[in-house]
Each structure stands twice: as structure tokens, then as C-alpha cells.
Swiss-Prot record:
Listed name of the protein: Large ribosomal subunit protein eL37
Keyword Iron-sulfur among UniProt keywords: no
A Gene Ontology biological process term: translation
Cofactor: how bound: Binds 1 zinc ion per subunit.
GO molecular function, a single term: rRNA binding
Zinc finger extent (C4-type): 20-38
Assigned protein family: Belongs to the eukaryotic ribosomal protein eL37 family.
Domain of life per record: Archaea
Main function: Binds to the 23S rRNA.
Native source species: Methanococcus maripaludis (strain DSM 14266 / JCM 13030 / NBRC 101832 / S2 / LL)
Keywords: Metal-binding, Ribonucleoprotein, Ribosomal protein, RNA-binding, rRNA-binding, Zinc, Zinc-finger
Gene Ontology CC annotations of this record: ribonucleoprotein complex; ribosome
Keyword Acyltransferase recorded: no
Cofactor: Zn(2+)
Length: 64
């Protein structure tokens, strides 16, 4: 094995995120033990923000 730039390309094996057991998305960070999508591991509440939905003027439901 040599050192240098060619060797750095071999460092991209493996994955940081696995499937989250709460939301089912591939967003659970293995080392941090936190889901990037739903916040599992950090809080008991599902992670959500107002900017995720389009603002509605007048009557009607919010559209995702």
C-alpha cells in the first residue's frame, strides 16, 4: 500500500447512515446515533418545521 492521493480514494467504503427504526428512512447516523430525518435518538418528538409545508392562503389543508 502506498501513501498519497491514490490511497485516499480507498477511504470511501462503508456508510454513515443506516435505516432508522422510527421513520424507516436511511438517515440514522451510526456514530452519532441520531436520525437526520426524524430526530430519533435526540428527542422523543418527531423532527418537523413549518417550512416543510407550503403556506396556504384561505381555506384548505397544508400541502407537503
Amino acid at each position: 500500500m502506498t501513501k498519497g492521493t491514490p490511497s485516499q480514494g480507498k477511504h470511501n467504503k462503508g456508510s454513515n447512515h443506516i435505516v432508522c427504526r422510527r421513520c424507516g428512512r436511511r438517515a440514522f447516523h451510526v456514530r452519532k446515533k441520531v436520525c437526520a430525518a426524524c430526530g430519533f435518538g435526540r428527542s422523543s418528538k418527531i423532527k418537523r418545521f413549518a417550512w416543510q409545508w407550503k403556506k396556504v392562503t384561505g381555506k384548505g389543508n397544508r400541502v407537503k
